[in-house]
């Protein structure tokens, strides 16, 4: 009843036909999927059997820690909070869903809040908007990453067994403790922490400096494949332009069953838009 979009009719080789149509859509991450129903109809127009595939589970459990460079060279800070706001609003945050914590570093490291501090998207967004830049004349990126690994991803602070750990590192300069970076990244690899690294080129552009060494360092922080885990933006204002791509790549980590999958779009099935009959089986889509 009331099916006006996507209705499919397919002839049954044994007589009669199959009629399909979508029922309703449900959201999983940033994407929407439609379930539907198909009915076998006899040559005398009697319904023989109805088939309605069950809705697949939408997996959105991730433990995400955002590691923010808050040193003096980040400017304006409002662009960082705008980036956080845009990224967080598209996450389904909760104790049984995605959890988010934020660490800020410069010369020292501060936990702004832990994975289990807040339990709704609104609470996390409000807390992120209240974060103030702590400053510092040095950029201790290795220290920031290692502190997040050691302290933020603990069960006491909300990390869950069996849930994918994700770290998002945002920085605008080469680290002053880069001699420790490889050791710290190796530890993250050992603990299966997926890392997305974002290089902000603003301070280099303002100072007319080469970005080559900086970009190479941030690429070394990102998980493999690098092209899926590394981003660079021209300045702080441009951070919001990568939110959609970053969000989709983060969500794909849990939503895809294949660890090497690059996209979530083909992972969830739909029914009601198409059908194909063979002698012994029916394919729905």
Swiss-Prot record:
Organism encoding this protein: Gallus gallus
Q: Where is the VWFA domain?
A: 66-279
Q: Which family does it belong to?
A: Belongs to the integrin alpha chain family.
SUPFAM superfamilies for the chain: vWA-like (SSF53300)
Molecular function GO labels? phosphatase activator activity
Matching Gene3D superfamilies:
von Willebrand factor, type A domain
Tell me the classification of the organism that encodes this protein: Eukaryota, Metazoa, Chordata, Craniata, Vertebrata
Q: What is its main location?
A: membrane
- Which InterPro entries would you find in this protein's record? ECM_Assembly_Org, VWF_A, vWFA_dom_sf
What protein name applies here? Integrin alpha-1
Tell me the subunit arrangement.
Answer: Heterodimer of an alpha and a beta subunit. Alpha-1 associates with beta-1.
This protein's domain notes: The integrin I-domain (insert) is a VWFA domain. Integrins with I-domains do not undergo protease cleavage.
